[in-house]
């Protein structure tokens, strides 16, 4: 069966989400599907385009108008699904429900394709805390129930049985053990424990909660030492404000 795995952004080799998507595509292929990966790409010369694997399916141009076409011109993806006779479409939600994504899904369904959408984090409204962020999600909040009504299912890592009024397909989050083999060496943790977090750090990783836990732990003046090593940049101002002051105020720099 031909399948399309659709995302609405590009890739970064060091990004955990990018790696996870490639793991998912590999897993679907190992289940016997003929999978094409559709994604948004910006060439070295600044040309914006929609890609299916290594093939360009739509040139969007450069500049502001190209960004607008990226959000509004989704017919090229539906056309690709129809032209290639793809029977199964797996969409990774970008919190971008709108009339254009709805029309794209309707066209795919009209030709007999089964369409499911993965919502990696649910609920997700609480992730948008500033007014500009909330405003950007306003369109999604207006149209997401309508979009969901045209789907064959919503894939979730949560325990929710229904999302936006539609049934869910509940799966577990995972990794590719071929790409990340299990560690076999056992370290001595008799006297101290070293934790490591390797990421482009975003607030959803929860590093701030771990650090606050360390602050409470060291208030008890413990003999057993616990260290947390963060490898990777703090991605934004929110992450800096939630992590750095806690370290400074509780004198955790050594830990």
Task: Set out the residue ranges of the language-model regions.
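Nucleotide-sugar donor-binding and catalytic loop/hinge architecture
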Residues: 1, 178-194, 218-223
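N-terminal subdomain of nucleotide-sugar transferases
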Residues: 1-44, 53, 84, 149, ...
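Conserved donor-binding/catalytic core segment of Leloir-type glycosyltransferases
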Residues: 4, 186-205, 211-214, 229
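Acceptor-binding helix/loop patch of EC 2.4 sugar-transfer enzymes
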Residues: 8, 12, 115-144, 176-178, ...
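Membrane-proximal helix-turn-helix segments that form the acceptor-binding/catalytic region
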Residues: 26, 75, 99, 103-111, ...
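Short N-terminal targeting/anchoring amphipathic segment
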Residues: 78-99, 113-116
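Donor nucleotide-sugar binding/catalytic pocket of nucleotide-sugar-dependent glycosyltransferases
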Residues: 141-183
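Nucleotide-activated donor-binding/catalytic signature segment of Leloir-type glycosyltransferases, i.e.
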Residues: 232, 240-255
């Amino acid at each position: 069966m031909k399948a399309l795995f659709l995302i609405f952004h590009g890739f970064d080799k060091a990004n955990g989400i990018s790696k996870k998507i490639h793991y998912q595509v590999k897993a679907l292929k190992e289940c016997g599907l003929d999978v094409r990966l559709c994604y948004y790409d910006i060439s070295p010369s600044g040309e914006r385009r929609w890609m299916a694997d290594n093939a360009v399916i739509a040139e969007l141009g450069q500049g502001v108008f190209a960004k607008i076409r990226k959000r509004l011109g989704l017919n090229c993806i539906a056309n690709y699904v129809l032209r290639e006779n793809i029977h199964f479409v797996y969409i990774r939600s970008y919190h971008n429900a709108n009339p254009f994504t709805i029309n794209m899904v309707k066209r795919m369904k009209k030709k007999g394709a089964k369409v499911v959408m993965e919502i990696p984090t649910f609920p997700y409204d609480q992730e948008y805390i500033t007014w500009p962020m909330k405003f950007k999600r306003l369109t999604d909040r207006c149209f997401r129930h309508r979009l969901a009504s045209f789907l064959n299912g919503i894939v979730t890592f949560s325990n929710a049985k229904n999302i936006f009024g539609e049934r869910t397909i509940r799966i577990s989050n995972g990794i590719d053990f071929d790409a990340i083999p299990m560690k076999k060496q056992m370290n001595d943790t008799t006297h101290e424990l070293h934790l490591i977090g390797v990421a482009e750090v975003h607030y959803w990783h929860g590093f701030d909660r771990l650090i606050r836990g360390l602050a409470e732990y060291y208030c008890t003046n413990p003999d057993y030492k616990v260290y947390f090593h963060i490898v990777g940049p703090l991605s934004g101002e929110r992450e800096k404000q939630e992590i750095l002051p806690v370290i400074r105020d509780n004198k955790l720099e050594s830990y």
